[in-house]
């Protein structure tokens, strides 16, 4: 069974011709027309020319197979062949007349085979053959008439064969021949080779590879070049044979060769190729074969570089023929230009360095080319230091881009320099403005700005204050507050109608600003820099908070004294509404036994802030402290209309007078009911009651000002009025005020809102703020310096962020505080 299976498989392989046909690649045209058939390297390789290929094929490639012979029967059906490639086969026999049917064949490649000779019968019928390649064969004999059937041959390659001799008439009939490769053959330099050497001198081989032609025998001539002498001696085969075979028979010119050269202009133009046969052995052919200028065309090399060359072409009779300058590259050529003048200067560019080029002057007639003279030269090699001319604009583009980039760098550098210089000037101006602002905050706006700067520049000389203002606070309740000062303070704070900037508004309100003692003013430009500014701002903030806290304490005590009276006071005979509030004694034990009329109001000062504490102070004292609560009632000549209870927390120990210093810190006492009573203006009535024990009962009318309805932080000056208002108007101020969005913006300006984002005094600094500063500071700072810095930022943000009427309200608030302090 196994044998039957193998036999069946073998029969299938033999009976299927499609398996072989599939190995050829066909490029077909219309109607089954085949342009190219590639059957090279077939597996299995072809041993005969395949017959399944369409007969219309033009280019047939059968290279690298195992063809043994070329027969007429295998080629006669391919009548349209123009190219036949039989390279690298095992062809050793070509039948005579095998190519009779190939009348259109132009290229025949038979290289790398086993041919031993070339005869006329092997090449018969190929009248249009132009290129014949039979290199690397075993050819020993080429008959003199082998190429007589191929008059159109342009290139013949017989290199690397076994040719020892050639007849002088072998190539004489090939008028169009331009390339004849004979290198690699073992020539026998005897007298029978002299005829071939005579033809070789006349022939202008395009490749000019004369140095590869040398003698192999006899022994005394081994290694001699056939034509070109060696550099170290002038001996070559043709000179030796010329002297040795002088009496020998010279080869007669073939009948098919044109008539001898004649200088007459009426000769047949195409009868010769421009060489005089009398000069065949007169000179050795140089590297560039040129003739006399008077005899025929000449070509000379004028200049050569590594990428260009300049040729000079001289034509005695330019109009006798059509002359063309042709460039040859091995077996191919290309026309460069048509020569129409007697002397042409041709410039050749785009050449490669260290490359050999061949240019010939050729005449054309009847579609045939006749070489007159050729020139072969080699371009120069690149030398370090020589600059090759650029054939592209790459360098130009690169230089343009680099120039643009360099220009952009210069422009950006100039812009950066200008911006940096401008920024430095702005920072310098800003520093001057900050110092000027600090000086104005310290000395007030009454002093001229120029004099302040001039005074600040004088180190060691304290500036002279134009107005000495005191911020003393009455420590005893029994003191009488002069009404004239209060009236002046009240009339001295009109609301500014026009809008202005921060400096203008604050300069206008500088008359009510607080002055610092002259001995407490440090030097401005003493090298300490920002430390002095922060310290100055912090002290100013401390002073403002001291005044605010004192005024708030006074208001709370006055409100408590008004609301604490049962009824009927010194103003009982009046029809106006009056509030009677009495102050509490210092000792909490005596508060329950003492009469309201005998209460003495303590000092305005609050308990001092202890710096050793690490937590923010609470503004409300605990209910466990010794506090006595008083109730305030509304009394009039009639019945009681309404009553509202207010609570007031009073510390159990009186505040010492000695604590009222500029660096002391004060704590506001918040009302548990968050009553706006501590922010309402107090208007004194016509008469006031008196109390014993050094205490005093103040009969005051409460009149809401227009500031109260606008901003919670507004604290206008006291208004003293002689007239009396209605009861409804006097009681309406007791209603709790609501805070609008606009009011809450500047609520930080009041010390009671100590839980805001920024503290207005160092005493309101909290632990969380301290931790934030600890997180971002690069080095450890002093605790007091951090507190002063926070205070300075708070004051700056509160005042500088205010605009227009908001700024006026802030200034009015401080004016009211100042007026209350003066009272």
Swiss-Prot record:
Transmembrane parts of this sequence: 398-418
SMART domains to which the protein is assigned, alphabetical: LRR_TYP
Modified residues (Phosphoserine): 622, 671, 675
Start and end residues of each LRRCT domain: 185-247
GO biological process, one term: synaptic membrane adhesion
Cytoplasmic side of membrane: 419-823
Keywords: Glycoprotein, Leucine-rich repeat, Membrane, Phosphoprotein, Protein phosphatase inhibitor, Repeat, Signal, Transmembrane, Transmembrane helix
Residue ranges of domain Fibronectin type-III in the record: 292-379
Topology of this chain in the membrane: Single-pass membrane protein
Residue stretches of each LRR repeat: 56-77, 80-101, 104-125, 128-149, 152-173
Places the protein is found: Membrane
Region (Disordered): 249-294, 590-624
Segments on the Extracellular face: 23-397
GO cellular component: postsynaptic density membrane; synapse
Domain of life of the native organism: Eukaryota
SUPFAM superfamilies in UniProt: L domain-like
Molecular function GO labels: protein phosphatase inhibitor activity
Record's keyword annotation contains Signal: yes
Glycosylated residues, chain numbering: 54, 80, 85, 117, 205, 247
Signal peptide: 1-22
Role: Inhibits phosphatase activity of protein phosphatase 1 (PP1) complexes.
Protein name: Protein phosphatase 1 regulatory subunit 29
Native source organism of the sequence: Mus musculus (Mouse)
């Amino acid at each position: 069974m196994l044998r039957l299976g193998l036999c069946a498989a073998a029969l299938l392989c033999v009976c299927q011709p499609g398996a072989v046909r599939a190995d050829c690649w066909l490029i077909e045209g219309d109607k089954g027309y085949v342009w190219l058939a590639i059957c090279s390297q077939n597996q299995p390789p072809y041993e005969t020319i395949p017959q399944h290929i369409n007969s219309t094929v033009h280019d047939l490639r059968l290279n690298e197979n195992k063809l043994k012979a070329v027969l007429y029967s295998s080629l006669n059906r391919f009548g349209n062949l123009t190219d036949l490639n039989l390279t690298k086969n095992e062809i050793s026999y070509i039948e005579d007349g095998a190519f009779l049917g190939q009348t259109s064949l132009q290229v025949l490649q038979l290289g790398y085979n086993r041919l031993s000779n070339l005869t006329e019968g092997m090449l018969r019928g190929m009248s249009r053959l132009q290129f014949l390649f039979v290199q690397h064969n075993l050819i020993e004999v080429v008959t003199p008439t082998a190429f007589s059937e191929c008059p159109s041959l342009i290139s013949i390659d017989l290199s690397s064969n076994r040719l020892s001799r050639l007849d002088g008439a072998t190539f004489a009939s090939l008028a169009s021949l331009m390339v004849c490769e004979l290198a690699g053959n073992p020539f026998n330099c005897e007298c029978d080779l002299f005829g071939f050497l005579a033809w070789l001198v006349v022939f202008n081989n395009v490749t000019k590879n004369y140095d590869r032609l040398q003698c192999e025998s006899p022994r005394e001539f081994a290694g001699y070049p056939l034509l070109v002498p060696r550099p170290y001696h002038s001996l070559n085969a043709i000179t030796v044979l010329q002297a040795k075979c002088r009496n020998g028979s010279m080869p007669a010119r073939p009948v098919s060769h044109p008539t001898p050269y004649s200088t007459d202009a009426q000769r047949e133009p195409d009868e010769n190729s421009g060489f005089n046969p009398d000069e065949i052995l007169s000179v050795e052919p140089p590297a560039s074969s040129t003739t006399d200028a008077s005899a025929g065309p000449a070509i000379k090399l004028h200049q050569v570089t590594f990428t260009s060359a300049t040729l000079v072409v001289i034509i005695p009779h330019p109009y006798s023929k059509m002359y063309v300058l042709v460039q040859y590259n091995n077996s191919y050529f290309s026309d460069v230009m048509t020569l129409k003048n007697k002397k042409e200067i041709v410039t050749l560019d785009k050449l490669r360095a260290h490359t050999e080029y061949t240019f010939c002057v050729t005449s054309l007639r009847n579609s045939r080319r006749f070489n007159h003279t050729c020139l072969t030269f080699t371009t120069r090699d690149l030398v370090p230091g020589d600059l090759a001319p650029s054939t592209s604009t790459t360098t130009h583009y690169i230089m343009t881009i680099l120039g643009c980039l360099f220009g952009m760098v210069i422009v950006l550098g100039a812009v950066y320099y200008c911006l940096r210089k401008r920024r430095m000037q702005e920072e310098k101006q800003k520093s001057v403005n900050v110092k000027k602002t600090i000086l104005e905050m310290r000395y007030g706006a009454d002093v001229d700005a120029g004099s302040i700067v001039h005074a600040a520049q004088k180190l060691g000389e304290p500036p002279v204050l134009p107005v000495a203002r005191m911020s003393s606070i009455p420590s005893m309740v029994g003191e009488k507050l002069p009404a004239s000062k209060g009236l002046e303070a009240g009339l001295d704070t009109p609301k500014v109608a026009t809008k202005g900037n921060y400096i203008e508004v604050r300069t206008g309100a500088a008359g009510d600003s607080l002055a610092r003692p002259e001995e407490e003013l440090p030097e401005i430009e003493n090298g300490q820099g920002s430390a002095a500014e922060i310290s100055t701002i912090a002290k100013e903030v401390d002073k403002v908070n001291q005044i605010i806290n004192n005024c708030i304490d006074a208001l709370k005590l006055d409100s408590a004294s008004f609301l604490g009276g049962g009824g009927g006071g010194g103003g009982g005979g009046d029809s106006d509404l009056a509030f009677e509030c009495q102050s509490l004694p210092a000792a909490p034990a005596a508060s329950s036994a003492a009469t309201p009329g005998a209460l003495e109001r303590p000092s305005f000062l609050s308990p001092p802030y202890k710096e050793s504490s690490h937590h923010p102070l609470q503004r409300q004292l605990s209910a466990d402290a010794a506090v006595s609560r008083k109730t305030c009632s509304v009394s009039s000549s009639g019945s009681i209309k309404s009553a509202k209870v207010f609570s007031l927390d009073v510390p159990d120990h009186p505040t010492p007078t000695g604590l009222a210093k500029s660096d002391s810190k004060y704590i506001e006492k918040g009302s548990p009911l968050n009553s706006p009573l501590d922010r309402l203006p107090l208007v004194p009535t016509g008469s006031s009651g008196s109390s014993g024990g050094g205490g005093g009962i103040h009969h005051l009318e409460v009149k809401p000002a227009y500031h109260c309805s606008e901003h919670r932080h507004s604290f206008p000056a006291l208004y003293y009025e002689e007239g009396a208002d209605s009861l409804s108007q006097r009681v309406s101020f007791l209603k709790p005020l609501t805070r609008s969005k606009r009011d809450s913006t500047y609520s930080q300006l009041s010390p009671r809102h100590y839980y805001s984002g920024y503290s207005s005094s160092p005493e309101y600094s909290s632990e969380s703020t301290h931790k934030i500063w600890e997180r971002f500071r690069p080095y450890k700072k002093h605790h007091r310096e951090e507190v002063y810095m926070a205070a300075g930022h708070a004051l700056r943000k509160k005042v500088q962020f205010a605009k227009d009427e908001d700024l006026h309200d802030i200034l009015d608030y401080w004016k009211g505080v100042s007026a209350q302090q003066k009272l």
